[in-house]
A protein has these predicted regions:
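Short catalytic micro-motifs in class I SAM-dependent methyltransferases
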Residues: 111-115
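A conserved beta-strand element that flanks and buttresses the S-adenosyl-L-methionine
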Residues: 108
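Class I (Rossmann-like) S-adenosyl-L-methionine-dependent methyltransferase catalytic domain
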Residues: 1-45, 49-102, 116-131, 136-202
Length: 202
């Protein structure tokens, strides 16, 4: 486990990260209400404590959530049990998605893409494609640069051009829209919400 992943695991074990809001992200709820999410099988990559995954399961989707943090996965499983929701949670590195041996109609990434850059980002994008069905889709939300300047700490801010470049091969970008992340600190942060269709299987 990398140092960054160890830090995330410690955050889940001994605190409450700012992105844990004990509810689905508003942009995801809007996407569901608009019929954007296709099923039945949905994968939530970097699921954290399961806020989004549990919500999707409540909506009737067959949901698998993965996170590199075993502490986060344990919290997600507890949340699902408490709410009597059926969802599968797996402690797994995002680069090893193919080991799930399952393909999904929709893959969800709400908060992981912006952790990667360069060759690591390209490797991650390939891993996402490996678990998409033919014409499967990716709904991705990442921190954006349209609301501020890059900082020396905190999540990486992503430009729309970076998003388009990362998914220029093997994917068709359906749309990219301004959105926002809700946090448990009473603030919202600028984001991009993007929908992509996997085309390498065509």
């Amino acid at each position: 486990m990398s140092l960054k992943n160890i830090v995330f695991d410690l955050l889940y074990r001994f605190g409450k990260p700012p992105w844990v809001i004990d509810a689905p992200q508003p942009a995801l709820m809007a996407a569901v209400s608009q019929g954007v999410i296709r099923g039945p099988a949905v994968l939530d990559v970097g699921c954290g404590t399961g806020d989004n995954a549990v919500y999707l399961a409540e909506c009737g989707f067959s949901v698998t959530g993965v996170d590199v943090s075993t502490a986060a996965v344990a919290l997600a499983e507890r949340k699902a049990r408490t709410l009597s929701v059926k969802a599968r949670f797996v402690p797994l590195d995002a680069f090893q998605l193919a080991t799930l041996a399952t393909q999904f109609e929709t893959v969800l990434d709400f908060g992981l893409f912006h952790q990667f850059a360069g060759a690591t980002r390209a490797r991650y994008v390939r891993a996402l494609g490996e678990v998409c069905t033919s014409r499967g889709q990716l709904l991705l939300q990442c921190f954006s640069d349209h609301g501020g300047k890059a900082r020396w700490f905190g999540p990486r801010l992503v430009s729309q051009e970076e998003l388009r470049a990362a998914f220029s091969e093997g994917w068709r970008i359906e749309w990219i829209r301004p959105a926002s992340y809700k946090s448990n600190r009473g603030r919202e942060y600028p984001a991009w919400l993007a929908l992509m269709t996997y085309t390498n299987s065509e």
